[in-house]
Swiss-Prot record:
It comes from Clostridium pasteurianum. It comes from the Bacteria. GO terms for cellular component: cytoplasm. Belongs to the GTP-binding elongation factor family. EF-G/EF-2 subfamily. One of its GO terms (molecular function) is GTP binding. Its main location: cytoplasm. It is found in: Cytoplasm. The keyword Transcription does not apply. Catalyzes the GTP-dependent ribosomal translocation step during translation elongation. During this step, the ribosome changes from the pre-translocational (PRE) to the post-translocational (POST) state as the newly formed A-site-bound peptidyl-tRNA and P-site-bound deacylated tRNA move to the P and E sites, respectively. Catalyzes the coordinated movement of the two tRNA molecules, the mRNA and conformational changes in the ribosome. Keywords: Cytoplasm, Elongation factor, GTP-binding, Nucleotide-binding, Protein biosynthesis. The keyword S-adenosyl-L-methionine does not apply. This is Elongation factor G.
Length: 11
């Protein structure tokens, strides 16, 4: 998906 997927996983 995207590099921030691990951080965006909050949503």
């Amino acid at each position: 998906k995207y590099p921030l997927e691990k951080f965006q996983n909050i949503g």
